[in-house]
Amino acid sequence: SCGKHIWIGGTRGTVIHSSDGGANFHVSNVPGADSLDFRDLAILDDKTVLLMSAGPAESGAAKVFRTENAGESWEMVYQTKEKGYFFDAILWEGKQGLILSDPAGPFYGLVRISNKGRDFSLLNPATHPELQKGEAAFAASGSSLQKTKLGYYIVTGGGSKARVLYGKDALNWESIYAEIPGGEGTGFFSLGVRDAKNLWMGGGNYSRIKEGPVPVLESLDAGKTWSPVVNAPAYYVEKILWADPYWILSGPAESSAFDPVKKRWISLGKSPYHNVCRVGDRLYGVGGRGQIGFISLSQIQQLFLSKE
């Protein structure tokens, strides 16, 4: 979301846009993208958006489309067909952006974006940790890659350990946390950022949505150390979001809110939401089959008050 603009990517080349803070939504399809799953996007300004498709590059599913007229027309601005590439997340920060891809070589694929989303260049990291067998990032909500003023973070799964990788810049990476068992389809799916020091992460296994094999963890020192969040719900988490003054968790089984002052949790219901964004006082959740829902922060406050 950006200002009153909400953008949602979907399957079969679908894109949904609201320009009035969620009062009305317009559904359209990107021409030539019928087979693509738009799993993440980057909003550069009111009119400029980059849509990222997730899928195997060798089958033509690793593409980026760009609009500079708020979706009236779209242009494909980047594609790779190299086997192994699978885009997981895209972010934009000021004047440049970054795409995270599953590994196609010795490390994750990282694509630098510049020139207002027109230019793309594949990075060649100078230093990076060795990959575990099967290790990858998950494209669930586009939040396996995050940026703070201290650098970049990637949260991973699929390998024997779910890890946190840190890069002061996008060219020099280290593994800073590898304590939680991973495995196929299992690991960290989302990293949430309150500020440069205070981070949360969570995940699970996408085939066991009502179980919590991966704990929700908090760091207060920019990712150097992590500890379990007390009484965190045990379900598969696809998105963690800081929506001041609450932490929000969402997944296909349930959503929850945590008040860090009172150290208390409440459930926000069982509706399946893969991703959540904040627009003003409202949180918008996006689920499968075109489902969009919202709840206001004031409603969440009332839910906490009613439980006291």
Positions of the model-derived regions?
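Residue-level hotspots at or immediately adjacent to binding/recognition sites across diverse folds
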Residues: S1-E308
